[in-house]
């Protein structure tokens, strides 16, 4: 899908408007056969200085592993961005249009102590109430090896656990993940 396919969809997504402050994310990785291999949650802290968006992403995986990724994203023009991160190879490039972002980059993944280079084609879609959905297709040498599905949330007013929303009182949200079934 081309970014222009979402040009009239609202709410409008601009990374520098969405990511400053605290964001929560929950996601999973499915292999090319549709098997869920990992689940995770992330705490994301973002700052925007008028030119660069800095994101610190702290991941907690269902196996207890923790990981940190630090992004520096520059706005190139009205709708285009370039970014780098500690495990991204070269420069990530993206374009916002309407409520969506098309984002592509190469990354070094640590798989059981072995690093492999893969390509991400990521599509993000801003929804109402601070929710953003993301689907990233991961490929190696042009062959899809899996998909990461993510949900981002801003302005949380509910406690979230592995089984879902439990109450509607404002509270701090903590990651809790159970084993993959």
Positions of the model-derived regions?
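Amphipathic/hydrophobic helical signal segments and adjacent flexible N-terminal regions
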Residues: 1-37, 47-49, 147, 153-181
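Sequence-level preference for short, compositionally simple segments enriched
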Residues: 3-4, 42, 48-49, 122, ...
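Generic alpha-helix detector with strongest preference for long hydrophobic helices that associate
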Residues: 4, 10, 14, 21, ...
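Generic detection of intrinsically disordered/low-complexity segments and helix-coil linkers/edges
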Residues: 12-13, 65, 97, 119
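Hydrophobic core residues within well-ordered beta-strands of beta-rich domains
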Residues: 19, 42, 118-120
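Central antiparallel beta-sheet cores of small beta-barrel/beta-sandwich binding domains
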Residues: 26, 30-111
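Beta-sheet ligand-binding and adhesion/scaffold domains
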Residues: 81-181
């Amino acid at each position: 899908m081309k970014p222009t396919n979402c040009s009239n969809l609202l709410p409008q997504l601009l990374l520098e408007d969405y990511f400053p402050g605290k964001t929560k994310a929950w996601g999973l990785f499915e292999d090319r056969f549709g098997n869920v291999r990992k689940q995770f949650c992330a705490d994301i802290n973002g700052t925007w200085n008028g030119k660069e968006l800095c994101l610190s992403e702290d991941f907690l995986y269902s196996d207890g592993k923790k990981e940190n990724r630090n992004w520096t994203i520059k706005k190139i023009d009205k709708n285009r961005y370039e970014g780098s991160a500690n495990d991204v190879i070269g420069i990530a490039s993206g374009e916002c249009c309407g409520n969506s972002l098309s984002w592509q980059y190469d990354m070094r993944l640590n798989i059981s102590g072995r690093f492999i280079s893969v390509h991400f084609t990521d599509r993000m879609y801003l929804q109402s109430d601070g929710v953003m959905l993301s689907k990233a297709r991961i490929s190696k040498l042009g062959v899809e090896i899996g998909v990461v599905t993510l949900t981002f949330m801003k302005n949380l007013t509910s406690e979230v656990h592995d089984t879902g929303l439990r109450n509607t009182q404002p509270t701090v949200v903590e990651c809790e993940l159970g084993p993959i079934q």
